C-alpha cells in the first residue's frame, strides 16, 4: 500500500507537469503536424504510466483516463479538434478536461437553481443514485460467495458490476468537477439498458466520451479516406466497422494493463462482432427481424430486451473471460470492499474524534463562562465595598494575575492534549492500513 501511494504521487505529478507543458508550449505552435510532434513525447510517456501500479483499480483507471482518453484528446488538440478545443480559459480547467472523462456542456440547460453546485448535489442524493450505490454494495459482497453462484447468474453479475462502477464513478466525477470548475458538464452515461438498438447503445447511451473521441479521430478520417472511392452508404458502414476495430484494439491494450498478460484477441473480437452486427442490422436485417417478430415497428420494450440480452451474452462469451481467467475481476471486488471498509472505519473514527472535540469544546466554553461570571461578580463586589485602599488593590491585582495564569495554563494544556490525541489518531490509522 505504501509503495502504491508513492507511485500514485509520482504519476500524478508527472501527469500535471506534462499537461502543463501541453498548455503552454504546443499552444504556441500552429495546429497540424508540428504541434502533434510536440505532444508526441507526452503521449509516449502516458502509455507507460499504468505499469507503475500493481492495483487493478489504479492501473485500470490510469490506463483509461490517461493512456487512452488523455492521449486521444491531446492528439485531437494538435489539430484544433476534440474536447480541448477551444482552449480552456485557464490551466486548471485544461488539466481537468484533459485527464478526466468530463466534457463542457455546449448548450447549458436553464435550471432554477441559485447556485451552480445545487444540481450536482441533488443528483448525488437522488433516489436513483442511492439505489445504484446500494445495489453495487450487494454485488460486491456477492463475490464472497462466488463459488456458490450459478454460471448463468455470473453472466449478468459481471456486466452489472461494470455498469454500476462506471455509472457511480462518472456521476461523482461530474458532480465534483461541476462544483470545482463552476460549470455544467455533459453526462457520460445515459442509462444504457434503455437502448433499443446496438447503434443506439454504443452511440447515445454507453460511455459518451468514447464516441466523441473516436468519431473525429477514426470514423471521420476513414470517411475522408474513402470519399470518392465508394458510395456513401458503404463508406459509412466501413467507417463504423473500422471504429469498432480500433476500439477493440484499444480495449485490448486496456486489458493488458490490468491483467499484465499477452492479449488473446477476445476483447477485440467482441467489438468487431458488435461492429459487424450494427452494419448488418442497419444494412439488411432491420426490417427482416421486425417482420419475423411480427411487428413492422417493434415495441421499444422488446427491442431493449433483445439489445441487452445480446450485449450480456456476447460480453460473457468474449469480454469478461480474460478478467475471470486471471482473477482480476475478483481483485476488483476485493479492492473495492477493502476501500469501502477503510472509508467506513475512517468515518467512524472521525465521528468519534468530532464527538470528543465537541464535548471538550462544550466543557471549555462552560469553564470560560464560569470564570468570566465569577470575575464579573468579584469586580461588582469590589465596587460595592469601595475597596480603594492600597492593600486591597494589591490583593485584587494578585488575584486577577493568578486567575489569568491559571486560565492560560488551562488553555495551553487543553490544546496540547488535543494535538497529541489527533497525532496519535493519525499514526494509528496509518499503522493499521500499512501506510
From Swiss-Prot:
Enzyme Commission designation: 2.3.1.75
Signal peptide per UniProt: none
Subcellular location: Membrane
Transmembrane segments: 7-27, 36-56, 59-79, 120-140, 149-169, 200-220, 238-258, 263-283, 300-320, 363-383, 406-426
Catalytic reactions of this protein: a long chain fatty alcohol + a fatty acyl-CoA = a wax ester + CoA
Keywords for this protein: Acyltransferase, Lipid biosynthesis, Lipid metabolism, Membrane, Transferase, Transmembrane, Transmembrane helix
Keyword Hydrolase appears in the UniProt entry: no
Top-rank EC class of the record's enzyme: transferase
Biological process, per Gene Ontology: lipid metabolic process
Major subcellular location class: membrane
Topological type in the membrane: Multi-pass membrane protein
Annotated PANTHER family: LONG-CHAIN-ALCOHOL O-FATTY-ACYLTRANSFERASE 10-RELATED, LONG-CHAIN-ALCOHOL O-FATTY-ACYLTRANSFERASE 3-RELATED
Membership in a protein family: Belongs to the wax synthase family.
Function (record text): Catalyzes the final step in the synthesis of long-chain linear esters (waxes).
The name this protein goes by in its record: Probable long-chain-alcohol O-fatty-acyltransferase 11
